């Protein structure tokens, strides 16, 4: 399926838009996961068995029944098996549409969002709306693992190249958690930079850290959505390194009041939503 499919041409990304102030669920726009999975050959059978797109929404406001503005922060878990992912700008516009709309309480807003996102994604979605006080107590966290970024290597190419992972393993069997803060890709539609921290947890033949870092850096001028990049990394690692167990998790920096943090694994449970230094 070509990326010039009508489902991408109609997206609000990159287009001049008006901001609605009254609740409007029709602002949400789906992107079929098959657009990317077809190219990876995983439309029917994914190599990961656990996963979600974990969103944090920082800019949520509505009016209570007396017209007093309310604010909250939301944790949203969009199941990897949903038919669609949610296009981020449409999600922002949708959230903005709550601003001048009255709701009875937190629960009414949470249930409304969950219902609308399930309908758009065509799959399971969990929404947890939190008072700001909950986040006041939240610490800046870091992802556990060895950082592979401080290597004295020369980089001359920034074009995506999965072949950096060719012959990337030794015969030594290990369990490793690896972290890189150098993940950068570009939005598929607008070419805006997307900055992320990548976490890889695997059991299997030891992966060469230099080859892995060169592979991660090769995303630097690559155009794909966050969710698609993580699934591509998972598939490439399974193809070249063939680990027995694998988790790929990326936490991207915030844009438009939203951060997107895709998690894919074949052995680990979903993590709690946390916050890194760059988020």
Curated annotation (Swiss-Prot):
The keyword Ribonucleoprotein does not apply. It catalyses: 7-aminomethyl-7-carbaguanine + 2 NADP(+) = 7-cyano-7-deazaguanine + 2 NADPH + 3 H(+). The keyword Heme does not apply. One of its GO terms (biological process) is tRNA modification. Its main location: cytoplasm. Coiled coil: none annotated. It comes from the Bacteria. The active site is at 187 (thioimide intermediate), 194 (proton donor). Pathway: tRNA modification; tRNA-queuosine biosynthesis. It is an enzyme of class 1 (oxidoreductase). One of its GO terms (cellular component) is cytoplasm. InterPro entries: GTP-CH-I_C/QueF (IPR043133), NADPH_dep_7-cyano-7-deazaG_red (IPR050084), QueF (IPR029500), QueF_N (IPR029139), QueF_type2 (IPR016428). SUPFAM superfamilies: Tetrahydrobiopterin biosynthesis enzymes-like. GO terms for molecular function: preQ1 synthase activity. NADPH binds at residues 88-89, 255-256. Keywords: Cytoplasm, NADP, Oxidoreductase, Queuosine biosynthesis. HAMAP family: QueF_type2. Homodimer. Belongs to the GTP cyclohydrolase I family. QueF type 2 subfamily. Catalyzes the NADPH-dependent reduction of 7-cyano-7-deazaguanine (preQ0) to 7-aminomethyl-7-deazaguanine (preQ1). NCBIfam families: QueF. This is NADPH-dependent 7-cyano-7-deazaguanine reductase. The lineage of its organism: Bacteria, Pseudomonadati, Pseudomonadota, Gammaproteobacteria, Pasteurellales. The gene is queF.
